[in-house]
Amino acid sequence: MTQDELKQLVGQAAADYVNANVPEGSVIGVGTGSTANCFIDALAAGKTRYRGAVSSSLATTARLQSHGFKVLDLNEIDSLPVYVDGADEIDHSGAMIKGGGGALTREKIVASVSDVFVCIADASKLVETLGSFPLPIEVVPMARTSIGRRVTALGGVPVVRVTKEGVPFITDNGNEIIDVKGLRISDPRTLETHVNAWPGVVTVGLFASRGADLCLLGTDTGVDTIRFSKG
């Protein structure tokens, strides 16, 4: 299968999971990116089962609304039974690198309040050790250089994310992103806590303290379900 076909496969599998496990009238948390878009497209047929969705980005909001979903403010929600999102990398503990699409902060906020985090990905995203994919850090613009120096001290190579026009990429929150290359992340939870404590960091794209509960992994032979122990 092509990567696009695998994304469609896991998008449908996630919609099937949500329809089977989430009560009618619930609100669904939805991530950002091409794989999350496949989930939105697949869930659209059953959208009347749900009160609405909480979106992790302006792009996801537009996609949801194009299918007729009501998009709700997270501040209006008492509970969020499930959050579905893709990953740039995921390891065998359920820790992830996310933020390739630039929505890491809102993704982390929505994931943090969800009861179940369902990661949807193709098999190429499952890795033994995180770090081959550059690690995004959302930063307040005035702290970009100082955070870059801290990244270098860790052994990473900081690269300011730019648009195709060559200007800094700006997140939905008005911040910039540093992509860190060259890290081998053997202890993602500790690194997440460490980087998040740097002045000027909004959040780092490590999802380890609140990782995935299960992963629907697309392979050439179908969808594998991986459940992660949080004990």
Swiss-Prot record:
Q: Which GO terms describe its biological process?
A: D-ribose metabolic process; pentose-phosphate shunt, non-oxidative branch
Does this UniProt record's set of keywords contain Iron? no
Q: In which pathway does it act?
A: Carbohydrate degradation; pentose phosphate pathway; D-ribose 5-phosphate from D-ribulose 5-phosphate (non-oxidative stage): step 1/1
Per the Swiss-Prot or TrEMBL record, the active site comprises: E107
The family database entries (Gene3D superfamilies) matched by this protein are listed as: 3.30.70.260, 3.40.50.1360
**Which UniProt keywords are listed?**
Isomerase
Q: What is catalyzed by this enzyme?
A: aldehydo-D-ribose 5-phosphate = D-ribulose 5-phosphate
Q: Which residues bind substrate?
A: T32, G33, S34, T35, D85, G86, A87, D88, K98, G99, G100, G101, K125
Q: What InterPro entries does this protein map onto?
A: NagB/RpiA_transferase-like, Ribose5P_isomerase_typA_subgr, Ribose5P_isomerase_type_A
Task: Identify the Pfam families for this entry.
Answer: Rib_5-P_isom_A
GO CC terms = cytosol
User: Per its record, what are the GO molecular function terms?
Assistant: ribose-5-phosphate isomerase activity
Q: Which EC number(s) does UniProt give? A: 5.3.1.6
Q: What does this protein do?
A: Catalyzes the reversible conversion of ribose-5-phosphate to ribulose 5-phosphate.
**The family this protein is said to belong to:** Belongs to the ribose 5-phosphate isomerase family.
Q: How does it assemble?
A: Homodimer.
State the name under which the record lists this protein.
Answer: Ribose-5-phosphate isomerase A
